[in-house]
Amino acid sequence: MKVSYCIPTHDGNAKCQMYLFDIFHALEAQTDQRFDVWISDHSKSKKVYAACEDYADVLDIKYVPNDKMRGNISANTNNALRPADGDILKVLFSEDFILTRTLNQELIQAFDNTPYQWAVTGLSLIHI
């Protein structure tokens, strides 16, 4: 079983490349490496492409430029999902964090042990 991490990206935020490096670094550290990464890029610059090139020798990254409906997150997300070929498709937005080295392992185990074919994940921080 393989996970495809589908990441819609853009260059609307000055930190977009830094966030992508954070995701790539966390994926590189995963204990289970049965995954690939699909990047749909709504950028006008080459920052996202350059980040993908920096990790091309370490991660299985598929870069998909996307100039259609630029700025529409739904269209960009669909563009990342459409070509992905993993058994599990996991959307990660470019500002998302991976907080554990076992995310991929946990996703695969969760789908191995259940009849369900979809799931939603999220995180909420509450400041008191």
Task: Outline where the language-model segments fall.
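Short, acidic, metal-binding catalytic loop of nucleotide-sugar glycosyltransferases
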Residues: 22-34
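Short beta-strand/loop segment that forms part of the nucleotide-sugar
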Residues: 34-44, 64-66
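A conserved acidic beta->alpha catalytic loop
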Residues: 40-50, 93
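Glycine-rich, basic loop-to-helix element that forms the pyrophosphate-binding segment
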Residues: 67-84
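Short beta-strand-to-loop acidic/aromatic patch adjacent to the donor-nucleotide binding site
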Residues: 86-97
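Acidic donor-binding/catalytic loop of UDP-sugar-dependent glycosyltransferases
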Residues: 96-110
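A short, conserved acidic/glycine-rich loop-to-beta-strand motif
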Residues: 114-123
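Conserved small/polar residues in nucleotide/adenosyl-binding loops
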Residues: 126-128
